[in-house]
Amino acid sequence: MDKKILVVDDEKPIADILEFNLRKEGYEVHCAHDGNEAVEMVEELQPDLILLDIMLPNKDGVEVCREVRKKYDMPIIMLTAKDSEIDKVIGLEIGADDYVTKPFSTRELLARVKANLRRQLTTAPAEEEPSSNEIHIGSLVIFPDAYVVSKRDETIELTHREFELLHYLAKHIGQVMTREHLLQTVWGYDYFGDVRTVDVTVRRLREKIEDNPSHPNWIVTRRGVGYYLRNPEQD
């Protein structure tokens, strides 16, 4: 079955170009042109991926992303203005998986769409009870099969990308990973991507698993190199 992609952009020429190129790649494409319509179509279609413009009438892309994330975990790629760093950060902070800046190349956009769909496909949670391959790091427990994380027996709600990042760091506990390496392995980008995406996702993760996110003890920064996961409860 073709993957369903929802394109949300109030500029019809851009939406038409996106639809044309995505259909050429074999995707089933639907378009929405304002925020309210986008939310309704997400409920109706439950697409496999959303391309979401920040600037929309009625309800902007940030609010749409917030509403979608309350119920769904499909990849969301934000479409942002070229120089709008704040839009990029806000989009990632509220749960978007990635962003593409306008004007964008078709090659870059398709690469990001494929990478996000590939990660979603290969890491989809199983519909079964957690198995014995769970990872224990002190009071932090990761259940890869069920896509669940708990700390001190309390479930922690993570987005798809947050889980993937934490899981990867946990499998390589104590090893410092560069942002570029994490972008390639967790996000699946071979040549596209902004390492700021990694920084924002790490910050979101810290807010959820750290006792004091301002002074992280689990996900540690190695200045000038990258990040690594440790077990502070062993110290």
Curated annotation (Swiss-Prot):
Sorted keywords for this record are: Cytoplasm, DNA-binding, Phosphoprotein, Transcription, Transcription regulation, Two-component regulatory system
- DNA-binding region listed in the record: 132-231
- Extract the coiled-coil ranges from the record: none
Q: Which GO terms describe its biological process?
A: regulation of DNA-templated transcription
Where on the chain is 4-aspartylphosphate found, per UniProt? Answer: 53
Tell me how this protein assembles.
Homodimer.
Q: What this chain does, per the record?
A: Member of the two-component regulatory system WalK/WalR involved in the regulation of the ftsAZ operon, the yocH, ykvT, cwlO, lytE, ydjM, yjeA, yoeB genes and the tagAB and tagDEF operons. Binds to the ftsAZ P1 promoter sequence in vitro. WalR has been shown to directly bind to the regulatory regions of yocH, ykvT, tagAB/tagDEF. Activates cwlO, lytE and ydjM and represses yoeB and yjeA.
Q: PANTHER family annotated for this entry?
A: PHOSPHATE REGULON TRANSCRIPTIONAL REGULATORY PROTEIN PHOB, REGULATOR OF RPOS
Stored NCBIfam families? resp_reg_YycF
The protein in question is named: Transcriptional regulatory protein WalR
Q: Which organism is it from?
A: Bacillus subtilis (strain 168)
Encoding gene (name):
walR
